[in-house]
Amino acid sequence: MDYNRLAELLFPHINTTPEEMEARYPKRELPEGAKVTRMGPSPTGFMHLGNLYGALVDERLAHQSKGVFYLRIEDTDRKREVEGGVQMIIDAFKSFGLPFDEGATTDGETGIYGPYRQSQRAEIYQTFVKSLVQRGMAYPCFCTEEELSAAHEQQEKNKENFGYYGKYAVWRDRPMEDIEAELAKGTPYVVRFRSEGSIEHKIRHEDLVKGKMEVTENDQDVVILKSDGIPTYHFAHVVDDHLMGTTVVVRGEEWLATLPVHLQLFRAMGWKAPKYAHTAQLMKIDPETGGKRKLSKRKDPELALTFYAQEGYPVPAVLEYLMTLLNSNFEEWRRANPDLPMNDFQFTTKKMSGSGALFDIEKLRDVSKNVISRMTAEQVYDYVAEWSAVNDKEFNALLTRDPAFSKAYLAIGRGGKKPRKDLALWSDAKGYMDFMFDELFQPDYTMPERVSAEDAKAILSDFAGMFDENDTPDGFFDKMKQIASAHGYAADTKAYKADLSAYKGAVGDVSMVVRVAVAGRQNAPDLQTVMGILGKDKVLERLSKCADAL
């Protein structure tokens, strides 16, 4: 077989040599130990939590080592591509604050290792496929879908491995005359890699997450170039990761089965393969069966990245929670360093679990409460305003009508060793703040069991006469004690517990009456501070309305 002639028949338009192509992509000048990672999503219109999970690993490995994290759009499967898919990818990662150093952008790309869209790299791939044909390591295959299906059925009947190999690789050694005849007829074809592997052989490999392993050598003549001249993922990622200088490939463990193919292709090209980190799949406890299962696009809305923006999960909280899944020692570090930014944590693949990572949305809410509790009132206000401007315009108008008023309320209990943890989501803010706005105030005047309606009215009347918005919390409580004593309630809880029959109730019951009148509920932040923010007129108005309703 004249392989040079075959290569010219298949690629008459390719005049560039592999050496010339490689010269376009200089070796990266980076510090020793710097890692180059990439995110390579497909523009299918659906960005999921697994994408973010892997991207966080990519970003940390690169930026902790003073390396490069870039975005490459893997759009070789045109059937699955949706309009606007690339924009969705870029917007998703931008919203989660994962900074790419180079790669595809909204209006083009940045960096010297492009194009960063695989659909624009056809000449590059075909240059290297042509070189494989010239070396007798690749060949055209004219099999129809019907012929491939028939072979599959025969393999199933014979209980053989599926695929294109051995006697089923019918175009592997066909003579030039047969190839020329099909080309003359214009028969569509793909280009396959000529594998010299055997399933009898094992390859030793060390994965950054899974550790040392043995995998079966690839014996399949896989397709490397489709009939439209665009490569398959197998070949495209090998060429791109070599030319772009990728040193670590992070991907889901579902890709482990393709590892022998990729290692074989790197060897065939004479290139050093990057290190691979195959991450565990995200699992959850099925509420119906109680067993573990993979997160499902159909069953689990939390798989979609859009879910977190719509529900109002803080971006830092989502990232911190994912880090707890990625590194087993992160929670311990966070407890010891509550005020440090997450990026101060030294992430390592050595602490990643090789088995399924269990996603628990309630645990995410807990992490989110902790993250929000460490924020300033100004930060919380800004985030809630940003979220509500898109998702709850009515609340946004009230929140932003008087920023100082809203921030003053959000500042209650913030700071100190034990900050309040009322908010897990930005969408929780409306329910947390609603009683501060007359437009949302829907009071529940349910009083403590030990307080009669007559006593409640008297307590409210007394408090209205002595209310001072400038009181300290201690000053307010002293007044509660006075009112309690005047109406037969213990001014001291210990005294009440010592002789229950001597009192109607305790001072806590009295202060709860005022809390219910002002806040319209029994659970609210520090009442004296709340009343100071509402102002005297509003407090007296609410005391009066409550008394009238009893």
Report each predicted region and the residues it spans.
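Residue-level signal for inorganic ion chemistry
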Residues: D58, I89, L132, G136, ...
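Glycine- and acidic
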Residues: T37-T44, Y70-D75, L243-V249, E302-L305, ...
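Catalytic adenosine-cofactor/nucleotide-binding cores of aminoacyl-tRNA synthetases and other
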Residues: G270-R450, A519-L550
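Active-site cores that bind ATP or allylic diphosphates and position pyrophosphate for catalysis
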Residues: Y139-H278, M283-L295, A304, A464-K481, ...
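Glycine-rich phosphate/pyrophosphate-binding loops
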Residues: H63-D77, F235-R251, K272-M283, P525-L543
